[in-house]
Each structure stands twice: as structure tokens, then as C-alpha cells.
């Protein structure tokens, strides 16, 4: 076998391989002998068909199979010998084959980039320092009460905390625009569902009133024909409702799994959940900064094949979230996922180099702790833990999570980490909008 390697462009490589004719003939003969033992041809007993007839009947297909097999096996041998690390599936380009002659073919593929980590000491990370206090728990309890609230009709003017039922007709320069009309539209104030100025125009009005408000569509509005336009909305306010919050009764509290139904028990449960969320938010905040710094400090070429693979994964995930199938996933524009896919590949390659350089292995104690932490959010944590322990794929996924955490900790040990005091609400709001 003769092998030559050339660089096509960037990470692209082409390996050209020549297989000796005698190697091909030897492999073909071996396969024909195997075939002769099992073929059935009228006039001959099984296993006693003359080789010349077997070759006449099956020679072409056997030879084709042998060439395909030799192409793959010799390519594997070649990349091992040349110490090449392909990224993605190779593309085989067969040459012209003539029986009894050497066979030359080429294989085109991309390789993984050579990664040399640098400037890790320049990475800057702000670590949030925050605790859950009583006021945070009070706010969360108020949120829980609002989630369980009922609505009661009122004759009072609408406020920023109320719910309104209304008809509206929107127009620009006197012309009603598409999507600008609605009947019995229920608007919960304060959720930011409408364009700026709409809710403010409703606040202060009572049920039964008819009025007009002037608003401006934002410059970045999703509908091209409405961007930056001034519009009028004729509104009929049919109903205003005020929110009635439930009292912290024993019955209400037990809905949240607090067996004794006490306010103290609910506060303790809420605090525990908030502290778990806080721990995860701090961890993710620090991790994101560390990885952002790693990516900024280390610009690398990315194999297109790996990016395409990630795009396919993201497409399928997006389709699954909205109840789609494989066909619908394939129809989603690749541009929607290209940037995210490229970043995932870059991060994977860089963290992989951190893991390799520092010879990191998944810490089984950390894996166990991660599973226990995740399971604590469920009604029966032990059942979840046992489910994971019996599922090899889930355990391997969790080991990968642990290994990634260990890689990030290695980065943090070299980075400039400063502590920044903050509050629970500030951190969680940053996490939501990030």
C-alpha cells in the first residue's frame, strides 16, 4: 500500500492510496472460496460448484465488495500510520479500476485543529456573592400567591396590576392593518405582551369606556411593514378585574408538598428551593464567563463537518420542542443554528484540550453529588437516583457534565476571579435575560 497526504485548504486533507493488484486478487479469491461453499446452482451439489463458474456468476459483485472493503480498511491503516485525526465522515473518491492492475483512490476529509491554549491567565471572571434572605423568601411567597390568584370584576379604573378584557382596532394613517383587530382580548397588565404605550393607555380607564390611544411600533418590531410606524388603537374596555390573592392557609400550603401545612414549613421549603436555584445560577454565571474568556483568548479553525453535525442536532431538538418530526427538522433553515453550532464546536474543542492537557477524569464523587442535587428537585429523590444508576447512557451523560465542571474549575484556577456582591433578584433576573 502506497500512501500520500496533502492539504487541500485549511483543515481539509486528501489521502491518496494505491493498493497492489496482488492484494486485491488475493482478497477476491478468498471471498470467492467462501461464496463457493454456500452457493446453489442447478446441476451442482451445494459446495461443489467449480470455481470458474462461481467467479463467472459472482466475480463482479465480489470484486466490487472487496474494493469497498479494502478502501475503508486501508484508509484506517493510513491515518493510523500518518497519525491523522479525521473530523467528520470521509468522502471516498475511487479511481479507475482495471482487473489485474494496482488500484488508486483518494479520500477527502477534514482534520481536528491543533489547539494550543494561551492567555488563560487573562480570563476575567466576576463571581456573584449572594445569599437568600428573608425578604427574598417573602417575595417568592408573594409570587406563589399571585400564581394561584383568582380574578374578581371591578368598577374601578384599571391599574398596572389588573386584568382587562377589551376589543381593539389598530390603524395607520386611517387604514386598519393586518393583525390589528381583536375581540374579547384578555390583557394581563405588567407582562409586556403589548407594544410600549398600549398598556399605559388602558390604565386609568373603567369598564364600559371607549377611547383611542396613540402608540409607536418599535424600530425592531418583527413585522417589517409596522417597524417604527405611528398607530392609533380604538379600544372598547369591556371588563376590568382585580387579582385576589389566596391567604396562606393550611390547605393552600399543603398544595406545595408541605405536610404540616405551616407557614414556617412553607418558608423552609421555599428557601431550600431558592438556595438550590441560586447555587445553579452562580455556577452557570461563573462557567459562562470562564468559557467566554477561553473562546476570546483562543481563536481556532473549526471543521465544517462538525458544525454541520451540531446544526443537525440543534434542528432535531428544535423540532422536538414544537412537536415536529425528522422531516420538519431538516426543513428548518441552517442559518438559524449556525452561530450556536459553531460556538458549541469551538467550546467542545477547547474544553477537550483543557481536559487532555491536565489529564482530567470524571470524579465519581462529583458525579454522585450532581445526581443527588438534581434528584432533590423531585418528589422521590431516591427513585431518581436509582433510575440514573441503572441507566448507562444517563450515567455517562452525567460524567460528561462532571468532567466539564472540572475543566471549568481548572480554568478558574488560572483566571482572575473577583467576587461581586449582588442580590438574589438581580442575579436571577440576569440569568433569565442572558
From Swiss-Prot:
Belongs to the FKBP-type PPIase family. Tig subfamily. Involved in protein export. Acts as a chaperone by maintaining the newly synthesized protein in an open conformation. Functions as a peptidyl-prolyl cis-trans isomerase. The gene is tig. The lineage of its organism: Bacteria, Pseudomonadati, Pseudomonadota, Gammaproteobacteria, Enterobacterales. Keywords: Cell cycle, Cell division, Chaperone, Cytoplasm, Isomerase, Rotamase. The keyword Iron does not apply. PROSITE patterns: FKBP_PPIASE. InterPro entries: PPIase_dom_sf (IPR046357), PPIase_FKBP_dom (IPR001179), Trig_fac (IPR005215), Trigger_fac_C (IPR008880), Trigger_fac_C_sf (IPR037041), Trigger_fac_ribosome-bd_bac (IPR008881), Trigger_fac_ribosome-bd_sf (IPR036611), Trigger_fact/SurA_dom_sf (IPR027304). It catalyses: [protein]-peptidylproline (omega=180) = [protein]-peptidylproline (omega=0). Consists of 3 domains; the N-terminus binds the ribosome, the middle domain has PPIase activity, while the C-terminus has intrinsic chaperone activity on its own. Its main location: cytoplasm. It is an enzyme of class 5 (isomerase). Residues 161-246 form the PPIase FKBP-type domain. It is found in: Cytoplasm. This is Trigger factor. GO terms for cellular component: cytoplasm. Its EC number is 5.2.1.8. GO terms for molecular function: peptidyl-prolyl cis-trans isomerase activity; protein folding chaperone; ribosome binding. GO terms for biological process: 'de novo' cotranslational protein folding; cell division; chaperone-mediated protein folding; protein transport; protein unfolding.
